[in-house]
Amino acid sequence: MNLHEYQAKQLFAEFGLPVPEGYACDTPQEAFEAAGRISTAKKVVKCQVHAGGRGKAGGVELHDTKEGVKEFAQKWLGKNLVTFQTDANGQPVSKILVEEASNIANELYLGAVVDRASQRIVFMASTEGGVDIEKIAEETPELIHKAAIDPLVGPQAYQGRELAFKLGLEGDQIKQFVKIFMGLGNMFAQYDLALLEINPLVVTAEGSLLCLDGKINIDSNAMYRQPKLREMHDPSQEDEREAHAAQWELNYVALDGSIGCMVNGAGLAMGTMDIVNLHGGQPANFLDVGGGATKERVTEAFKIILSDSNVKAVLVNIFGGIVRCDLIADGIIGAVEEVGVEVPVVVRLEGNNAPLGSQKLAESGLNIIAATSLTEAAEKVVAAAEGK
């Protein structure tokens, strides 16, 4: 689950990190009043969406007057912001962040992720702040400095000092950086984060460090024990189909192709998408129905897949391990009858009671195309999607 910038900065402030004075506003009038409370001559106004590239898309501006801030809010609130990280429809803007402008002398990068290889939280810092860190990692990896956090002892001050030295910080800036580093390390573990970024972490003209931006992603599997963060969830930023799928414990990710995929197991789902691509098709989604593929969940899965108008055919690829293929077949038949599926459906069953499941599908009288192998299934669904 992602947080908005203003929410990330609220958490930063709770852990004693320096953030600009700012206010999240729901209406143009609130933005006008917030601008009046900010003492700096210039005010920064930012659209709050779960996407990067806001500045280039016109979603971040600098204004001298309260009226200019209000006009910006009137322009964007209730509209969709399209950036290079969104689809063509963009994401809805329901809040505007109004905050004080800063005198920037230097921009740094500070972030942390869970590194699965080392099984550690790993901090990354760079002197190249304010730009795409992935580009820096690819072109000049030597500019990224890392510190792995031992889960038994947590972040250590000496690690923060080492990073500060490598970033060229001096004097009191080192103490400030260590405080930020320690706060972020504790926050990462306490709130079950998957990723956090401050890009840029700026050195102001006065010589102080300031968290100018904030990005936080929380491990969705840990949300059950993070009630405070659950309240920060903004469903308007999610794909409606993905939100619907989550209610049924279906793992769904919308893609741009024309072949709907329904599979049990994430690994098999990725393999299915790969082989569809290999045979010239384009998957319309990733959908893992999991081990408990009941009729109800299969029905909802069909509804979600078919809510995408680009879907021209559906591939159902089920491996019966714990779940029996004949029960899956009953679910598919019931779902197709209930939903009224009009596009071709290709089904490949393998494993526990697969012959019985295939027999049930064949005797159903429905327009279901059977396949005995994954290659055959991919070939048939690609042909069906092309109308062949």
From Swiss-Prot:
Record-linked PROSITE patterns: ATP_GRASP, SUCCINYL_COA_LIG_3
Required cofactor(s): Mg(2+)
ATP-binding among keywords: yes
Domain ATP-grasp: 9-244
SUPFAM superfamilies per the UniProt record, alphabetical: Glutathione synthetase ATP-binding domain-like (SSF56059), Succinyl-CoA synthetase domains (SSF52210)
Reactions this protein catalyses: succinate + ATP + CoA = succinyl-CoA + ADP + phosphate; GTP + succinate + CoA = succinyl-CoA + GDP + phosphate
Subunit: Heterotetramer of two alpha and two beta subunits.
Role according to the record: Succinyl-CoA synthetase functions in the citric acid cycle (TCA), coupling the hydrolysis of succinyl-CoA to the synthesis of either ATP or GTP and thus represents the only step of substrate-level phosphorylation in the TCA. The beta subunit provides nucleotide specificity of the enzyme and binds the substrate succinate, while the binding sites for coenzyme A and phosphate are found in the alpha subunit.
Similarity comment: Belongs to the succinate/malate CoA ligase beta subunit family.
Stated name of the protein: Succinate--CoA ligase [ADP-forming] subunit beta
Organism: Aliivibrio fischeri (strain ATCC 700601 / ES114) (Vibrio fischeri)
